[in-house]
Curated annotation (Swiss-Prot):
Protein name, entry field: Thymidylate kinase
GO cellular component, as recorded: cytoplasm
Keyword ATP-binding recorded: yes
Organism from which the protein derives: Desulfotalea psychrophila (strain LSv54 / DSM 12343)
The EC number(s) this enzyme carries: 2.7.4.9
Alphabetized CDD domains for the sequence: TMPK
Gene Ontology biological-process annotations: dTDP biosynthetic process; dTTP biosynthetic process; dUDP biosynthetic process
Length: 202
């Protein structure tokens, strides 16, 4: 076990906010400072995560309760196999989506947000949650522009408006709001400022 305490930094927000791009940039920055960084994402590439991805094109395959159970099972495996061991080893874990996304997206489908959060109590609390904020329609335009395809069921405007409302209602002390409407470099600047404060970097 490392003498240096590991950290869990998560990136949250509606689709099209630029989370994946910002995680790559932050990982490169932290590694350039000599820090041991692991970048991960949810849903994972594990068996449960792959089943979740299949739902992006056909959500009629499972009930909403079964869908939620898949997210929980995928996260439990992620926590046990990667997140907890990495934190114990003193590494910095950057994660693209975590349980706040489950609360927001499944909450938008009608589940009780507090109940979802309670059911995720097995997962370690993030040291920092960077909530990238962008108007829903701007995010949808980014999705179709980058992928060259239509949005899926999780990315419809009405759904994302509900998701955004839930994200904004969350008031945990580890959440920091980031304006994702800025240039990529300016978004990264704001993210680095928050991360430096967390890691007590000069």
């Amino acid at each position: 076990m490392s003498n240096n305490p590991g950290k869990l930094i998560i990136f949250e927000g509606t689709d099209g906010a630029g989370k994946s791009t910002q995680i790559k940039m932050l990982a490169n920055y932290l590694r350039s400072k000599g820090l041991d960084v692991i970048a991960s994402f949810e849903p994972t590439n594990g068996p449960y995560g792959q089943k979740i991805r299949q739902l992006y094109t056909d959500r009629n395959k499972v009930t909403r309760n079964e869908e939620l159970e898949l997210f929980l099972a995928d996260r439990r495996e992620h926590v046990n196999k990667l997140i907890n061991p990495a934190i114990s080893a003193g590494k910095i874990v950057l994660c693209d989506r975590y349980y706040l996304s489950t609360a927001a997206y499944q909450g938008a489908l009608g589940f009780d947000v507090e109940e979802i959060l309670q059911r995720n109590s097995f997962a370690p609390t993030p040291d920092l949650a960077l909530l990238l904020q962008i108007p829903v329609e701007d995010g949808r335009r980014r999705i179709t522009s980058s992928r060259g395809e239509e949005t899926n069921d999780f990315e419809k405007a009405e759904m994302l408006e509900k998701v955004s409302t839930i994200f904004n209602s969350l008031s945990f002390p580890y959440i920091r709001h980031i304006n994702a409407c800025q240039s990529i470099d300016n978004v990264q600047r704001d993210i680095i400022m928050q991360v430096k404060q967390l890691l007590k970097m000069a």
